Curated annotation (Swiss-Prot):
<feature type="compositionally biased region" description="Basic and acidic residues">
    <location>
        <begin position="158"/>
        <end position="177"/>
    </location>
</feature>
<feature type="compositionally biased region" description="Basic and acidic residues">
    <location>
        <begin position="892"/>
        <end position="918"/>
    </location>
</feature>
<feature type="compositionally biased region" description="Basic residues">
    <location>
        <begin position="1000"/>
        <end position="1017"/>
    </location>
</feature>
<keyword id="KW-0445">Lipid transport</keyword>
<feature type="compositionally biased region" description="Basic and acidic residues">
    <location>
        <begin position="219"/>
        <end position="232"/>
    </location>
</feature>
<feature type="compositionally biased region" description="Basic and acidic residues">
    <location>
        <begin position="463"/>
        <end position="487"/>
    </location>
</feature>
<dbReference type="GO" id="GO:0016020">
    <property type="term" value="C:membrane"/>
</dbReference>
<dbReference type="GO" id="GO:0034361">
    <property type="term" value="C:very-low-density lipoprotein particle"/>
</dbReference>
<keyword id="KW-0427">LDL</keyword>
<keyword id="KW-0065">Atherosclerosis</keyword>
<feature type="region of interest" description="Disordered">
    <location>
        <begin position="889"/>
        <end position="1097"/>
    </location>
</feature>
<dbReference type="GO" id="GO:0005886">
    <property type="term" value="C:plasma membrane"/>
</dbReference>
<keyword id="KW-1003">Cell membrane</keyword>
<feature type="region of interest" description="Disordered">
    <location>
        <begin position="789"/>
        <end position="866"/>
    </location>
</feature>
<feature type="compositionally biased region" description="Basic and acidic residues">
    <location>
        <begin position="279"/>
        <end position="302"/>
    </location>
</feature>
<keyword id="KW-0443">Lipid metabolism</keyword>
<feature type="compositionally biased region" description="Low complexity">
    <location>
        <begin position="312"/>
        <end position="330"/>
    </location>
</feature>
Length: 1097
């Protein structure tokens, strides 16, 4: 449906334009499975344009008749949801709420609600100030339409039904329209200019998307619009209410509604589909539908700001719209956050205004309310979507909506957050954000919002920008989610950009120490996010858009989530839904953890710790405790540094963060996805902890290198090498990760589920094993991604642990550049073993153990072994499990053993080998991967076993297998001294070459022999044929080692034809039972011999 919506907008507009005068026909067509939301939006555009002149009013009325009919059914279906709002705007509100609730009830209602939005948009345009209820209604419609966007895809039938209902509702809508006109007159008295102004300002300013706080500068219609567009995303209604119900606001609302509907609307309701769909529709339909909706929202906001209906429409309808319009939009979410914050659920009108006041605070809080509000609103919208994603893609909004208590649920969550979030001035923002975020991540996003406000108010301007950029990225990410290959390209581009953004982002990771925590903990999410990415990552990304500035790492993780979704999503779109759901839960818990840590770092944690901890505990009890300890330690140390660094670096790296976010999104999340439990957490766990974690999360590893270097004893070397390496790695990572992502995501997704459990657990459990598990989870493909992440981490950790020092960074950097994957990993691993090992192990196991199940290295190792065990179990390699257990014995031993056991596991052959097995060598790095792919899993295991031995002998060998990793390992060896010597000593595993080559030869010979033997055995007598066909089959199908052996045997047999009977014929016959075996010069003779032989016998 997304593509249909993408492509149907023209059809929708054309149909809608034709149907403008045919309300029933409109409802009929809108009832079609064709995405009606776009039609509605387009019709809303057309009808709205017509409606601008009261001439369109007739059409509007017709459309409203349809909408009313729709509402009639929606009133029925959505009546339960409508209850709150019906009371408030019972006449118009009922239908509008019905629409809102209706589309909550069904996408048919939603789409029709959107059609209603069209009609309502038209009506609202014509009767822009007629009735704020109508505006809210239309706005709800628009938002409902947004929700409908996602619903309608699945509920086209319901749409058809609701078309009929829509007819009734449109009839009602006419009455409402009239009432709205009356109220519009009343509203126009203060805001008549709003009516006309809002109509075309609405249109003209639809273009002024970005803007200041909009509603605050109500006079600055376009500025407001721009700001409100975003602010309206969260504040549309509030800004409208604040904006004194001005047409400007309407304009703002329009654009804000675009963003709101794109963000707020589909954040809450349209979330999964609608984010992408609404993003597209927004782009497509934004002019019409979003305009109509924005107008409706704007009118609502205007009227609300007008204050006549501001309390009533805003309070009653908006609370309703908050209930349905929270869904209806982040504006509702924002207002609702404000409402829930100010009036919580009960004071919907007062709370709307309170929310507007809160929203004013929010809007006024540094535009912090507005920006943070916008961001929060977007976060809300996105996080509502995320929440809905939590509940199931749409369910968050739908669930709330179905509950008829969207705003109530959000309020409740927000109330919790309110309890959690002490600052109410911010809390309106936080609550609005949190409310939606609560929906999305219940408490986690709220903490983000709070932490975001704490750290983010400083950055809220940036947060707004970043939130907008993040949202824009989300739009792109959502759309790219739809077109994930695009995002893969974007991710690559972002990674390339990341090369340039890395240093700033490295700085961000510094401020992102706490962010790193978020990223690291968001990292477990990252995998789910990679799956959830479009939804939750966007939601988290939006929440991180607000918090993204704050939570550079979190934004990275969120954005990363987006990136992997772009990448991994494109790669594994099927898994994403499942993993997204699971990942959503994990995302909530993990985000809760990460946000919690971040907020702790921001010192907001204590407030939220209680709330976050349950979520985190739910998601990962051990991780929670460990993170709590880790966060306490980090929070103490990094809290101050993170706050200051975050603000400074976020400010400095504001744009860079965005770029890095977009970049780090994809790259980091990929690394994070596999690294989610691994690199991110491990990086966290590793020396620099959050900084590294975020750095790796942000830059994956390059930033980690620099951040780690910053945090590490050798910041200069670390940074220099890390950044040099980052640039190089950026390229290498882009190159490798593009491939690795695709492979690793494809390979790693199934594994990632396992690895996510294992890696999240193991990532929680231990940093080193976690990266290994991550690699295991993601496979070497991810290992390539993680490799540098680990490399960078280890560079960080090397930087953190001066053991690696600048040399390791440089060597690792260059080696990573060369190897980028395994070589760097080997280097990093050697760093672990070597000097860096001490620092890394100490930092990693201390922080890692903290992050991991145990604070003690043994605990982290045990956790690692356990997590790896899960990974190994997933891999089905108990050997590696044993090695994982042995891993606790010693990293070098583990390394070697793992190397021996997991041929792919330069770092953790353990986890990787299982992944390799899982991927059947897909994850096998470089030649191994191709080789493993060529080689069957069996032979892969053989090869692996054989390779593992050489790998055991020399991870550097494994690295050389990967290509130049031997050089890397050797370079590392020279850098690290004898550390790499043992690795590079052993030659490349000849067994691999032997195994693989014989296999290929066997295949060739088999195919030829079979080809020749088939006609032969066909000629052969039935009994011989019977004997022979099995042999041909095994060569063809089994390609079994026995076949290879017989081939080898037979070939030797050819030289000695006398071998059997001493007679050439028997020699030709050789073993009749073998079939013809390999094609050989004597095949014909052998065949003839066999044919002639059986006759005597």
């Amino acid at each position: 449906m997304d593509f249909l919506r993408l492509y149907l907008p023209g059809l929708h507009q054309a149909l809608r334009g034709a149907l403008d005068s045919l309300g029933t026909f409109v409802s009929y067509l809108l009832g079609d499975a064709v995405p009606t939301v776009e039609r509605e939006a387009q019709a809303a555009e057309e009808l709205g344009v017509v409606a601008v002149g009261k001439t369109g009013k007739i059409v509007e009325e017709e459309a409203q008749e349809d909408l009313e009919g729709l509402r009639g059914s929606q009133n029925e279906g959505a009546g339960r949801l409508r209850g709150p709002g019906d009371d408030r705007r019972h006449e118009v509100g009922s239908s509008a709420v019905e629409q809102t609730w209706g589309w909550g009830d069904g996408s048919s209602h939603g789409s029709q609600a959107e059609r209603q939005d069209s009609g309502a948009g038209e009506t609202a345009k014509a009767a822009r100030c007629q009735e704020p209820s109508a505006h809210l209604e239309a706005r709800k419609k628009s938002k409902a339409g947004s929700g409908a966007c996602q619903d309608r895809s699945g509920q086209a039938q319901e749409r058809q039904e609701s078309h009929e209902q829509e007819v009734n509702r449109e009839e009602r809508l006419r009455s409402w329209e009239q009432e709205e006109e009356e109220e519009e007159v009343r509203a126009r008295e203060p805001g008549m200019a709003r009516g006309a102004e809002s109509e075309w300002t609405w249109h003209g300013e639809t273009e002024g998307k970005a803007g200041a706080v909009g509603p605050k500068a109500a006079g600055d219609n376009r500025e407001m619009e721009q700001g409100v567009r975003e602010a309206d995303a969260g504040e549309t209604e509030e800004p409208g209410a604040e904006g004194a119900g001005k047409g400007e606001e309407v304009v703002v609302v329009e654009k804000a509604c675009e963003s709101t509907r794109a963000w707020g609307t589909w954040g809450p309701g349209a979330e999964p589909e609608d984010w992408g769909i609404l993003g597209r529709e927004e782009a497509r339909t934004t002019p019409g539908r979003e305009e109509a909706r924005a107008i409706l929202d704007g009118e609502e906001a205007r009227t609300i700001s007008g204050g006549e209906e501001a309390e009533t429409a805003s309070g009653g309808e908006e609370a309703e719209t908050a209930s349905g319009g929270e869904e209806a939009g982040t504006a509702s979410g924002g207002e609702e956050a404000g409402i829930a914050s100010g009036g919580e659920a009960g004071t919907a009108s007062g709370g709307e205004e309170a929310g507007t006041a809160s929203g004013g605070e929010e809007a006024g809080t540094a535009s912090g309310g507005d920006e943070a509000w916008t961001t929060s609103g977007k976060e809300e919208a996105d996080l509502l979507g995320v929440r809905q994603t939590e509940y199931g893609a749409v369910p968050g909004e739908r669930l709330l909506e179905a509950t008829g208590k969207v705003w109530v649920l959000e309020e409740e969550g927000d109330e919790e957050r309110e309890a959690e979030v002490s600052p109410f001035p911010k809390q309106p923002q936080v609550l609005g954000t949190e409310r939606t975020e609560e929906a999305a991540e219940s408490q986690t996003a709220g903490r983000e919002a709070v932490g975001g406000q704490e750290a983010g108010e400083s950055f809220e301007g940036q947060v707004d920008l970043r939130g907008k950029e993040a949202e824009m990225r989300q739009d792109l990410g959502i759309r790219a989610d739809r077109a994930r290959m695009e995002e893969l390209v974007q991710a690559e581009e972002a990674q390339e950009e990341r090369g340039s953004s890395r240093d700033p982002v490295a700085e961000l990771p510094s401020d992102g120490e706490a962010e790193g925590t978020a990223d690291l903990e968001a990292t477990p999410e990252a995998r789910p996010e990679e799956e959830l990415t479009g939804e939750e990552s966007e939601a988290a990304q939006t929440s991180c858009g607000l918090l993204g500035v704050e939570w550079g790492g979190l934004t990275h993780s969120v954005t990363k989530g987006q990136g992997p979704e772009l990448m991994g999503g494109a790669q594994t779109p099927t898994k994403q839904p499942e993993e997204r759901e699971a990942g959503e839960v994990e995302l909530m818990g993990v985000l809760a953890l990460s946000k919690e840590e971040q907020e702790r770092s921001l010192e907001a944690g204590p407030r939220h710790a209680g709330s976050v901890k349950p979520e985190a505990s739910e998601a990962f009890p051990g991780a929670w405790e460990n993170r709590t300890r880790k966060d306490m330690e980090r929070g103490n140390t990094q809290e101050d540094a993170a706050d200051g660094e975050q603000r400074e670096e976020e400010e400095t790296a504001g744009g860079q963060t965005l770029a890095a976010e977009a970049e780090g999104d994809r790259e980091s999340e990929l690394s994070e996805v596999p690294e989610a439990g691994g690199e991110g957490l491990t990086t966290q766990d590793a020396g620099c902890g959050t900084e590294e974690g975020e750095a790796s999360v942000s830059e994956n590893q390059e930033l980690d290198g620099s951040t780690g270097a910053d945090a590490g004893p050798c910041p200069s070397l670390g940074e220099a090498y890390a950044r040099e390496t980052e640039d190089e790695e950026a390229e290498a990572d882009r190159t490798s990760r593009r491939g690795w992502r695709l492979q690793a995501v494809a390979v790693g997704l199934p594994d990632r589920e396992d690895a996510q459990t294992g890696s999240v657990a193991a990532g929680i459990m231990g940093g080193d094993v976690v990266p290994h598990i991550s690699a295991a989870g993601a496979g070497e493909a991810l290992e390539g991604v993680l490799g540098q992440g680990w490399d960078s981490k280890e560079k960080e950790e090397a930087a953190a642990g001066e053991h690696a020092g600048g040399q390791e960074f440089g060597l690792e950097g260059s080696a990573e550049e060369e190897v980028t994957g395994r070589g760097s990993q080997v280097e990093a691993f050697e760093s672990r073993e070597g000097g860096p090992w001490g620092g890394r192990v100490e930092a990693e196991e201390s922080a890692g153990a903290e992050d991991s199940c145990g604070l003690d290295p043994a605990g982290s190792q045990t956790a690692r072994a356990e997590g790896m065990g899960a990974m190994v179990e997933a891999g089905g390699l108990l050997e590696k499990w044993t090695l994982l257990e042995e891993e606790a014995v010693g990293w070098q031993e583990r390394e070697q053993r793992e190397d021996s056991e997991g041929r792919c596991g330069d770092y953790h052959p353990e986890g990787e080998a299982p992944r390799l097995l899982d991927a059947e060598g897909l994850m096998v790095t470089g030649g191994r991967r191709a080789e493993a792919k060529e080689t069957e899993p069996e032979s892969l295991e053989h090869v692996r076993g054989q390779e593992e031995q050489p790998t055991h002998q020399a991870p550097a060998e494994a690295a050389p297998e990967s290509v130049g990793e031997a050089e890397t390992a050797e370079a590392m060896g020279s850098a690290r001294g004898g550390a790499a010597n043992s690795w590079s000593e052993a030659p490349l595993p000849g067994s691999l070459l032997d195994v693989s080559v014989p296999r290929s030869r066997v295949h060739l010979s088999r195919s030829s022999s079979q080809r020749r033997s088939r006609p032969s055995f066909r000629r052969t007598p039935a009994w011989e044929q019977q004997e022979e066909p099995p042999a041909p089959n095994p060569p063809e199908e089994e390609l079994s080692a026995p076949e290879q052996r017989p081939l080898q045997l037979e070939e030797p047999l050819e030289p000695s034809p006398l071998r059997h009977d001493g007679t050439p014929v028997p020699a030709r016959r050789r073993p009749l039972g073998h079939g013809f075996g390999l094609a050989h010069p004597g095949m014909m003779q052998e065949l003839q011999a066999r044919l002639g032989r059986p006759k005597p016998q």
